[in-house]
Each structure stands twice: as C-alpha cells, then as structure tokens.
C-alpha cells in the first residue's frame, strides 16, 4: 500500500530514520514497521543526480523479491520508546510545518547544547563514492564504476557487481548504501557482499582516514558550516609557473590586494603565492580551489596555508570561518 507523508511531525524517527536533508525519500516498510529499504539520495550535482524513475522501479522490484523470499532481510533500527521531533522541538516550532532539514537542525542543536556535537557529524550519510565505488542510478545497487586503487578495489568489488549487503545492511539502493555507511565506524573496516553473475562473493572494505569527508554545501541543515578558503586571486601564467618551478596544472595563484580579516590574522599578505592547504598538491585553478574547500572542510577547522613569499616556502595556520 502506498502512503504519501508530507509532514515529519507525526512520524516515529526511530522508524523513519533517513537523511533529512533530502527533498524526496521513499521508505519500504513491513506491516510491523520493519524497514526493507530506503530510496532517495542526492549530492552536490543536484537533487536528482542520484535518483530516477527507472532506479525507483528497480528498487521496488528488488524489495518485492525480498518480501517474497523465505527469510526477508531488514535494515537494523533503533527500538524502544518512539521518538518524535516534538519531543525536542522548541515550543515556538510547534503548530507550524517543520521541514525535514529543520528536524535535523533541531536534533543537532540539542546535541550541541548537550556537548555531544562534533565535526564528524557534519559528514553523515557519506556516499559509496568515498570508498571508491559508484552505484548505477537506474540499477540502484549495481556497481557502475570502481576507482583504481580504492578501498573498494582492494576488497574485490568490480563494475557490474550487484551489492547485496554493506556493513550488515541489506542494499537495494543508493539510499541503503548511505544508511549503511552512516552506521560505519570512523576507522577500521566493514563487510560487503555482492553477486557477480550467479556467484555470491564477499570482502572487507578498509576505511581510510577522513573517508567520510564529502561536499556539504548543498545541505540546508549545514549552511552555517560551509567553509570559505579566505584566500583568492589570479592564477599564475605559464611563464610564472616555470620561474617558480611549478607544474602547468597545480594550484598556484597570487593573493589579491584585499586580504580578508581571517587570512590577515593568520599572516597572509597581498601578493603571496598561494599553493593550497595542508601540503597537498592540488591539480586545479583558483576557482576550483574555492569549490574544493567548500566540499572538504568545515568552519572551525584549522588548516595550514602553503605559500611562497620572497622565495621562501611558508606554512601558516589559519582557522576557517
């Protein structure tokens, strides 16, 4: 039976546990509120970059097959007393429509006041791309691409494999994969199972440092955390790059004459030759660097600004705001 829910207030969030920054989410439930699957997802490329009607149909058929199996599998969920957004929403928020992303803001605000918030929470529901495999939009749990040398490659995953379980969560869709990775530890490894043709296979994916990091600039609930590099200017010419011993494609730009207060406080001066942050050689121009910082860092983090001044290389610590 299909039910359209347009408000989050009456929902038990222990059941309807998903990425609340999304504009569209489908939950496949059993009559006793066990979760078969979650369909929905997005990224910085746009609200529909990770979903399609064909993908929804594929997931529906996959879930129906699961439902008809002898031992249907369900996603893990928190049990116990139901939890509603009204339990923690401020009184002024009640009696009005609360959007899903606002529910997330209320939850995060409460955690912050209780001292439970940390920056890792900004990177919830990381996509499988972060571990090196991309799911097909129209065939929701089928691997489209695998990055060479990635954790997914090391685990044995190949394009065309059909992911069935990730971190103990049944996978029918991109949304299921995100839910599975949201539950994954900060470091260590997670299990993954897949079908390659008729063969059932499995492996372990090792979680690298900062593996959760992804672009949060599209998330309504996290706009206050989107960082700015606070340095910007004109890219070096080919001749200037040659004079400074730099490659033709690596990040290198002259800091413009107006230096923002945060950068000035860190010691950045007009005319500094900026090479990037944290000793990473980045293949991009100054504009792409702006987008890179927005996707990889959050406000409050301290970075080391790598620059050249009068022929000397310097690394100046700066807190992003």
Show where each model-derived region lies.
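PDZ/PDZ-like peptide-tail recognition elements
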Residues: 95-145, 204-256, 315-321
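Thiol-based oxidoreductase modules, predominantly thioredoxin-like and allied folds used
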Residues: 1-11
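Conserved PDZ fold ligand-binding element
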Residues: 152-175, 263-286
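PDZ-domain C-terminal substructure recognizer with occasional recognition of PDZ-binding tails
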Residues: 164, 179-217, 269, 275, ...
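Terminal peptide-recognition signature
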Residues: 133, 152, 160, 192, ...
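A short, hydrophobic beta-strand/beta-hairpin element that forms part of a small beta-sheet core
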Residues: 23-42
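Sequence context surrounding c-type heme c attachment/ligation sites in exported
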Residues: 1-3, 42, 46-132, 137
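Structural micro-motif
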Residues: 18-27, 272
């Amino acid at each position: 039976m299909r039910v359209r829910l347009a408000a989050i207030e009456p929902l038990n969030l222990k059941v309807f546990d998903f990425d609340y920054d999304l504009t569209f989410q489908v939950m496949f439930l059993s009559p006793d509120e066990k979760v078969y699957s979650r369909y929905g997802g997005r990224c910085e490329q746009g609200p529909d970059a990770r979903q399609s009607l064909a993908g929804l149909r594929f997931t529906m058929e996959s879930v129906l097959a699961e439902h008809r199996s002898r031992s249907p599998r369900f996603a893990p969920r928190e049990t116990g007393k139901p939890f509603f957004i009204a339990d923690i929403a401020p009184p002024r928020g009640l009696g009005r429509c609360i959007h899903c992303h606002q529910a997330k803001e209320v939850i995060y605000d409460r955690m912050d006041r209780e001292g439970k918030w940390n920056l890792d929470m900004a990177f919830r529901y990381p996509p499988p791309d972060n571990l090196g495999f991309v799911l097909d939009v129209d065939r929701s749990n089928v691997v489209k691409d695998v990055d060479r040398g990635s954790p997914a490659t090391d685990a044995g995953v190949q394009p065309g494999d059909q992911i069935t379980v990730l971190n103990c969560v049944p996978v029918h869709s991109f949304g299921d994969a995100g839910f599975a990775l949201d539950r994954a530890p900060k470091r260590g490894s997670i299990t993954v199972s897949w079908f390659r043709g008729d063969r059932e296979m499995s492996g372990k994916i090792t979680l690298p440092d900062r593996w959760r990091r992804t672009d949060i600039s599209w998330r309504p609930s996290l706009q206050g955390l989107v960082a700015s590099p606070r340095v910007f200017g004109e890219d070096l010419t080919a001749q200037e790059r040659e004079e400074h011993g730099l490659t033709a494609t690596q990040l290198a730009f002259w800091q413009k004459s107006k230096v923002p207060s945060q950068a000035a406080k860190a010691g950045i001066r007009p005319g500094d030759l900026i090479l990037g942050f944290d000793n990473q050689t980045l293949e991009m121009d100054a504009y792409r660097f702006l987008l890179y910082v927005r996707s990889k860092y959050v406000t409050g983090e301290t970075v080391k600004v790598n620059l050249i001044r009068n022929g000397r290389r310097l690394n100046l610590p700066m807190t992003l705001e």
